């Protein structure tokens, strides 16, 4: 059993199986890695318990984000080594004026907010990697992501 499967009840497994969600999905032939919102606003600036981390950024996940970073970094390096395109998403405080904020915390784009949308050093994008800058929670709404995927013929993320 894979580690995450321990969190799925037997009843849920039966539901998934009966509904036809069993086995592995096949990947496409031209995949890309999409790293969604792994930014300072969700990781914080350093490892710390979540109750302390939210004093720095109310959206921070605290220590669990820092625990995930080495795993994300490992996947990132594997994709780069295999020449799989890497795409990042981040919020863009400057877009909020046009599209509105993703939450009810309307704040002007301050230096603090600009720090929040930066990527942690250990998974920082290379210069040739695509960054989706967004005003809303979705990496697709009001962004160029679909255009990028179609132009690059990417068929799975």
Where are the language model's segments positioned?
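Active-site acidic carboxylates
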Residues: 1-126
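Internal catalytic-core helix/loop-beta-alpha segment
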Residues: 113-156
């Amino acid at each position: 059993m894979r580690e995450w499967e321990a969190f799925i009840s037997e009843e849920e497994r039966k539901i998934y199986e009966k509904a036809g969600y069993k086995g592995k999905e096949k990947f496409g032939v031209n995949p890309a890695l999409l790293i969604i919102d792994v930014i300072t606003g969700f990781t914080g600036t350093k490892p710390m318990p979540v109750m302390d981390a939210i004093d720095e950024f109310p959206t921070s996940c605290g220590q669990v984000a820092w625990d995930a970073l080495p795993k994300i970094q490992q996947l990132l390096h594997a994709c780069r080594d295999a020449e799989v395109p890497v795409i990042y998403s981040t919020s863009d405080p400057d877009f909020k004026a046009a599209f509105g904020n993703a939450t009810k915390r309307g704040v002007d784009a301050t230096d603090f907010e600009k720090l929040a949308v930066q990527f942690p050093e250990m998974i920082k994008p290379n210069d040739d990697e695509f960054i989706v800058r967004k005003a809303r929670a979705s990496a697709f709404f009001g962004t160029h992501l679909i255009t990028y995927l179609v132009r690059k013929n990417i068929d799975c993320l």
